[in-house]
Amino acid sequence: VPEAGRVNVALCLNIGSSSLKFALFRVTASGEACLASGLVEQLGTPGARAQLKVGANSVERACAGASISAALSVAFRLLEEQSLPRATVVGHRVVHGGREHLTPTAIDRPLLESLRALIPLAPLHLPAAISGMEAALEHWPGLPQIACFDTSFHARMPECAARFPVPAQLFDQGVRRYGFHGLSYEYVLSTLGDPPPRRVIVAHLGNGASLAAIEAGRSVDTTMGFTPGGGILMGTRSGDLDPGLLLYLLRENGYSVDSLEHLLERESGLLGIAGSSDMRQLVERAEHDERAALAIEMMGYQIRKAIGAYVAVLGGLDVLVFTGGIGEHTPSIRR
């Protein structure tokens, strides 16, 4: 937070494997104001497009086949063409910080190398984030750039929730529940008052989905685990499965480790059940398509189970919050 009278302009980047979201904020001691926000969708495809919104105005630009680096260049040009204030700091959402990175951290080469070592823990997310950080460092070599980690919020989770029932040496090596969507959970808490209600459950429901039980501002449990692939079913991710099923697929169905990872991360969840990971499409199809209706029912069922478990963990509930694209825009899931 800047000192009184000082103004920072922060560019916030959320880079995924297929999309780039960005927003420019004026930040003062009294709060922040969004100056512009944008999105580049369908990265790497012929249909890739960039959109920038400044107030009531919107600008679009085609960027067919754009890589993450090229998409960032388009986003930077769009911002510069609108004569917006130049960023004084860049913040990057980073999905996984492992055990080492528990607070926002200045981005430099050693940090990037340490994040590369974590790619096996978040193979869908970290390569894109690292590419984005490298591109932003190249574009603005003298600008402070900060990595903000989704895992930080859950770092003080009680050991009984963080630990898996596997040999102790694995826990000592970092095999534990890390939890994700922490930046979203922190933001939600900041909107609930100071101090926030004591017992809160947040359901962050988007293409990636998780829930968290929060007591007195502290994460006490969350559905995602060692990787962002655990927990409830998601757009293309399976969520939690019987480990015996994975052994069966490896031994009896001819899956390799890589093909099994692809199955669980990119071919499962809503997509595997109903042929689409887009909840909007599934809602439209549900009245006449049994698989679409089943996918919605299964996701809702798993969310209800998680909420019920967390009410028991917290000993009651003061506030239930839905956020994320599905959480905000799909009433049938909230019901």
Q: What do the predicted segments below correspond to?
A:
Residues 153-250:
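Glycine-rich phosphate-binding loop of actin/hexokinase-like ATP-binding domains
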Residues 75, 79-125, 144-146, 152-163:
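Short beta-strand-loop/turn "lid" adjacent to the catalytic site in phosphate-handling enzymes
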Residues 262, 266-273, 279-313:
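Adenine-nucleotide phosphate-binding core of ATP-dependent small-molecule kinases
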Residues 6, 15, 19-66, 225:
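Short glycine-rich, Thr/Ser-proximal phosphate-binding strand/loop in the N-terminal lobe
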